[in-house]
Amino acid sequence: MSGNEGMRAQGSHEHRELRRAELDPDPIRQFLRWFDDAESAGVVLPNAMALATTGADGRPSVRHVLLREADQRGFVFYTNHDSRKGRQLGENPRAALVFLWKALDRQVSVTGDVRRVDDAESDAYFATRPREAQIGAWASAQTSVLRDRHELDERVEEVSARFADAPIPRPPHWGGYRLTPDTVELWQGRPFRLHDRFLYTRDADEGTGWRVERLSP
C-alpha cells in the first residue's frame, strides 16, 4: 500500500455508537467512565495524551505527556517548568489535550486554562516517583541543547553523588500543572466517517454547569 493509499484508508470501525441519552451530564465523570473502558480493553498507556501549547509568538507546540490525575478540578500532568511547554504555559496559560484510544475508536479532546498545582501537591507526587526518575528531574535541563549523551550521563552521576542515599527533594524547576476544562469533546468512531461527536461547553446557565451538543462528523 502506498503512503497516499494509507492516508485515505477508512479504518475498521466497529458498530459502536454514542447516544445523547447515554452521556453523563458531567464531562469529567463521562471521561472517567471512558478511561475505565480503555483500561479494561487493555489499551497501553491509556493516560497518554497529546498536549498542545502556544507561546507569546503564537507558534504551536505539541507533545505527548502522561495524565497523573483527573477529577472535578481538572487534568493534572507534571513537567519541567523551564521546558518549552513550561515556558509557553507561562506566556499563554491555555492548552488543549487529546486522548486517543484506538482500540475503542474513541477520542477525547479538552481545552481550558492551565495553572500550576501548589507546591505541596507537587512535593507529594514527586515523592512517589522512582529514585531514578527523581535524579533525572534534577539532571535534565529539558529541551536545552546537549553536547552529546555523555554530558547527560555526567549530570546523572553528579546528581546521584550529590544526594547519595539521602531522600531527593523536588527540584524547584519541576512541578505539576492542572488544566481546568471549558470544553470537552467526545468522539466515537463509526463506519464511513459518520462518527458520533458530542461537545460539552461550560455554561453557568445550565443546571449541570455544562451544555451538551451533538456535532456533525
Segments predicted by a language model, with ranges:
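Binding-site signature for planar aromatic cofactors or substrates
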Residues: M1-P217
